[in-house]
A protein has these predicted regions:
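Electron-transfer interface patches adjacent to heme c in soluble/periplasmic c-type cytochromes
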Residues: 1-123
Length: 123
């Protein structure tokens, strides 16, 4: 399913894509075309998983799983799947971007964050 017409700003999304793959470092884990790194595990049958500390997520949710870790969520059609994060703790894409900006000390400006959100809405 495609995004509804006019649901994101194309110019801002283009700037956001550059941030996603550059200064924001999102593309190091969220790799196209699915925007996930789950297939980059040690072998074809073992997904790549992350400790909660790597992502800044609450470890309580991961500790209830068999692996005690998180997988990188694919971002395709992300605009359809609010709330975000494994526990639904981020109500908006803005909250997601703010979380990672803080956790990774990225220092993104308000305009950069807005562009990044527009890119995420375009996936």
């Amino acid at each position: 399913m495609s995004q509804p017409a006019g649901s994101f700003n194309a110019g801002a999304a283009t700037r956001g894509q550059a941030l996603f793959n550059g200064a924001a470092r999102c593309g190091s884990c969220h790799i196209a075309p699915s925007y996930s790194d789950v297939h980059n595990g040690p072998d074809a049958n073992t997904p790549l998983l992350h400790d909660a500390s790597e992502t800044g997520m609450d470890p309580a949710y991961a500790l209830r799983t068999a692996t005690k870790k998180y997988r990188t969520t694919p971002l395709r059609a992300l605009w359809q799947h609010a709330p975000y994060f494994h526990d639904g703790s981020a109500a908006t894409l803005e909250a997601v971007v703010n979380h990672y900006d803080g956790h990774f000390a990225l220092g993104l400006t308000a305009a950069q964050k807005a562009d990044l959100v527009e890119f995420l809405k375009s996936l």
